[in-house]
Design a protein with these regions (language model features):
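Active-site substrate-recognition segment that forms the wall
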Residues: 17-18, 47, 79-81, 177-287
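Short hydrophobic core segments
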Residues: 6, 167-177, 307
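C-terminal catalytic lobe of FAD-dependent flavoproteins
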Residues: 263-325
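Glycine-rich FAD pyrophosphate-binding loop
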Residues: 20-40
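Dinucleotide-binding Rossmann-like beta1-alpha1 core, especially the glycine-rich loop
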Residues: 44-118
Length: 325
């Protein structure tokens, strides 16, 4: 089978990976060079189905539970870090920690001593926390690049356009936010993030700081680089980060650790997450066209399950019930 995939973000690349593994001949079409226009480029890369369950449907937990294993198999060794997730809150916001715990599972309560054992940099900062030991994280930019390189090594062609779709048996649309206004019910959720660089703080895992209005996550990228995010604004505006969002993210980072106030601000970015009303993704087929969209803030977490669903739909295989919609 000859398949054309439109879109080289995380949804398109994972779908290509699954189809190639099943023997399909795949071409990927992407209008822009590189990944910088894809929401995937600005993602946190947290494979955190239990943390996401706090605000998401159970389907996100079920479909995302196997994501870390999928990425480990697809990427070079050491790309996925299985160090868990730490969720903390300032003393004044302790109620937020209990509210978070009441809405999910897969965690254990830990005290100040164990917090320090996990993250020495947070010594004396928090009295209690939630630790999610089964969660993981990866660097989205390295993951996207490695996935593309692996596909190219297997003969997948990446094209910038000018493709005659009639040449293909099947077309798969993974263009995400580009379909807002064309795909019924699809909306944009703006997400702003930043990168900080410092040698004064060291973290081994994603840390989520709870706040009634400005929750923060900070994800270590290695070498003193930290990704901090992310706002969630009901808008499809992909313009530069606003002064307000920048201030709020930096204030939250300072609350997590004062040394971050002296960190270098090396990058800011904005991505538009495509989402439906229920914030769950959809895979649909009409004749020889499949559409994958609505991954919202769960791109790296849910794309493996969606890719398997796409491959099964494309090739007529029976999908394991755990990944079915």
């Amino acid at each position: 089978m000859h398949v054309l995939i439109k879109g080289a973000g995380v949804a398109g690349l994972t779908a290509a990976h699954e189809l190639v593994a099943r023997g399909a001949a795949v071409m990927v079409a992407e209008r822009t060079h590189g990944f910088a226009t894809a929401a995937s480029w600005y993602a946190g890369g947290m494979l955190a189905p239990w943390c996401e369950r706090e605000s998401a449907e159970e389907a996100v937990l079920i479909r995302g539970a196997a994501a870390a294993g999928w990425w480990e198999a697809a990427l070079p060794a050491g790309s996925v870090h299985r160090n868990g997730t730490l969720v903390v809150a300032p003393l004044r916001d302790a109620a937020e920690l209990r509210r978070f715990a009441s809405r999910t599972s897969g965690y254990r309560w830990i005290g100040a001593e164990e917090i320090v054992a996990l993250e020495p940099a947070l010594a004396g900062r928090f009295r209690e926390a939630l630790f999610f030991p089964e969660e993981a994280h990866l660097d989205p930019r390295r993951a996207l690049s490695a996935l593309r390189q692996g596909l190219e090594a297997q003969g997948v062609v990446f094209s910038g356009g000018g493709i005659e779709e009639s040449r293909f048996d099947l077309t798969i649309d993974c263009t995400g936010a580009a379909r807002i206004g064309e795909f019924k019910g699809l909306r944009g959720v703006r997400g702003e993030m930043l990168y900080l660089q410092t040698d004064e703080v060291s973290l081994s895992r994603p840390v989520r700081l709870l706040h009634p209005r400005i929750p923060l996550y900070i994800v270590p990228r290695g070498g003193g680089l930290f990704m901090c995010g992310a706002t969630m604004i009901e808008s499809d505006d992909d313009g530069p980060i606003t002064a307000r969002s920048l201030m709020e993210l930096l204030n939250a980072a300072y609350t997590l650790h004062p040394a971050l106030a002296e960190a270098r601000l090396v990058e800011t970015g904005t991505g538009v997450r495509p989402a439906f009303a229920d914030n769950l993704p959809r895979v649909t087929r009409q004749n020889n066209a499949i559409t994958v969209n609505g991954l919202y803030r769960h791109g790296f977490l849910l794309s493996p399950a969606l890719a398997e669903e796409v491959a099964a739909l494309a090739l007529g295989a029976e999908l394991k019930r755990g990944n079915a919609r």
